[in-house]
């Protein structure tokens, strides 16, 4: 989320912890404390620490199927941006592309885009959310023009970018819809009324809803499917236990 701020944040190497700066494969549990450190799992997904909004320490333990936050020392005002977005993704994020990914792919070519996730929650102020990025060009670096967020959980007095525009039903679930702009890209957020811990769904259903609202066209490109947490405070123990995503044309 909020890619412009991420792009302007310089990398800070922590003095302690395992430092992973390249997206190398994770064969056993590894710890990432580097600000933008990442690694690959299952030979197809990238897990990233992505501590873009703070200089405070954050570490994640990466497993073969996901990750867990093990250190989180920062705190941010709840009326502003979060500390970070530790996450797992398929596709490309600032030139870091998952192995063998079919993304970017033009929306008109996409026939299926299934995804599934299992979250584990603890205390703190955070959201648990998918971050789905689209752009008019097949961009693999920089800020995309459209951000779709799917909030599976919201804890504390935090809210998405923009304001409420209504409610909708997607994938057999009800969602409160928010729309806005964070200064660099448009954002549409779908907020669940109560926490979701596990779900299998079609990313394409959300993309099609955004298209029906006139915010994108079928000529746009899906560039990445990401899932993780945005903590404002606390969060040690939050985890993505399992994640899967694929896009086929």
Regions found by a protein language model. Name each.
Residues 84-165:
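Extracellular-facing segments of soluble proteins and assemblies that are Gly/Ser/Thr-biased and enriched
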Residues 138-204:
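Short helix-loop boundary/capping segments
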Residues 74-85, 121-125, 139-143, 197-200, ...:
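Short, surface-exposed beta-strand/loop "edge" segments at domain boundaries and coil↔beta transitions
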Residues 1-28:
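Secretory targeting and sorting signals
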Residues 29-80, 249:
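N-terminal segment immediately downstream of the Sec signal-peptide cleavage site
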Residues 194-249:
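Long, compositionally biased interface segments
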Residues 31, 40, 66-70, 104, ...:
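Ser/Thr- (and often Asn-) enriched beta-sheet segments in non-cytosolic proteins
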Residues 67-71, 111-118, 130-132, 222-231:
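Short, hydrophobic/proline-enriched secondary-structure or compact coil segments at domain edges
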